[in-house]
Amino acid sequence: MLGPTWEPLAPTSMLGLEGPCWVGPGPDGGFAVSEEFGDVQLFGSAHQPLGSLGTLTGHNFGHPAGVCSDAEGSIIVADEQRHQVTLFPRVGPPICLQLEGLKRPLGMACAPQGQLVVADAGDNCIKLYQYLGEMA
């Protein structure tokens, strides 16, 4: 037996997405969805659309993949095509995190003490980076 049956909380459709690929937690109880065609859509805790990171910040993505948010409410996006990870703080411009050795970043998660765990499909491995507290 695998466990209890999972049922949807509410039958909700997020319309207007173009090739949704990855879903991750967003700030304030919301979530973020990366789209196959080059943007990341943000949704609030009541599932209401908040806009796209590209439109809100002027950032151009190659192929956004994994998304997550950190303890400070920043959204972090892996860009598979550009081989980079970008941090979108609550206030201010996007910051390209200088993470050495990324070949094809896909999934990621924020870990305790300001660490970022990245699944790098180009190297077939998981990479751990320290990013909070290390930026000047």
UniProtKB/Swiss-Prot annotation:
Keywords annotated in UniProt:
Repeat
Which Pfam family is an annotated match for this chain, by its short name?
Answer: NHL
Show me the NHL repeat boundaries. Answer: 48-91, 93-132
Q: Which domain of life is it from?
A: Eukaryota
Q: Which InterPro entries match?
A: 6-blade_b-propeller_TolB-like (IPR011042), NHL_repeat (IPR001258)
UniProt keyword Hydrolase, yes or no: no
Q: Is Transmembrane a UniProt keyword of this protein?
A: no
PANTHER family hit by this protein:
E3 UBIQUITIN-PROTEIN LIGASE TRIM32, TRIPARTITE MOTIF-CONTAINING PROTEIN 2-LIKE PROTEIN
User: What protein name is recorded for this chain?
Assistant: NHL-repeat-containing protein 4
> What's the source species for this entry?
Mus musculus (Mouse)
